[in-house]
């Protein structure tokens, strides 16, 4: 058994035994990456923070099921992805509020001379394009291209084959390219008409 696997099993055992210091260690080691994942999947800081708390509450309840077959971080990612996808499905009917606060940002230049609204619109375009991806493709894309996980790890996190992960990342990139290219073309047409 590798040292990191032994450390994962020992940390999980300490958490199960009620060692608050161990759970704090677990939280500090993984909270930032899990928050980042939740934020990128949800596009909303408040929702990501709420979900992060739910993820760690769930982890605390489910640590009994951790057997050490995968790294503790991978197990947490899988738990997080399941909760995130459940949350996304439950709110599928609600529209995201991507434009809050943009009305006042339009005329403020940043240090590079770009308008803040232009950067916000770029971010909104990306968020909208990501939101149009199927859940599996979006999750695989974010885990691979944003979080830096390997396809094998993504397979473990999402419960899919390594080849499926590769396929979903590829499909996500193609669809994002198509959606963002379409958005640029639409903006260009609108600006030509002014």
Task: Put a short name on every predicted segment.
Residues 46, 128-139, 143-164:
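Helix-turn-helix DNA-binding module
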Residues 4-5, 86, 94-119, 150, ...:
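Internal acidic/polar
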Residues 2, 14-25, 35-54, 162, ...:
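Short, charged helix-capping/linker segments at alpha-helix termini
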Residues 2-4, 14, 96-103, 127-128, ...:
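C-terminal edge and immediately downstream basic/flexible tail or linker adjoining helix-turn-helix-like DNA-binding
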Residues 64-68, 78-99, 111, 119, ...:
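Arg/Lys-rich amphipathic alpha helix in sigma70-family domain 2
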Residues 36, 50-57, 70-82:
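Structural recognition of an alpha-helix C-terminal capping motif at a helix-to-coil junction
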Residues 74, 81, 85, 137, ...:
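DNA-recognition helix of helix-turn-helix
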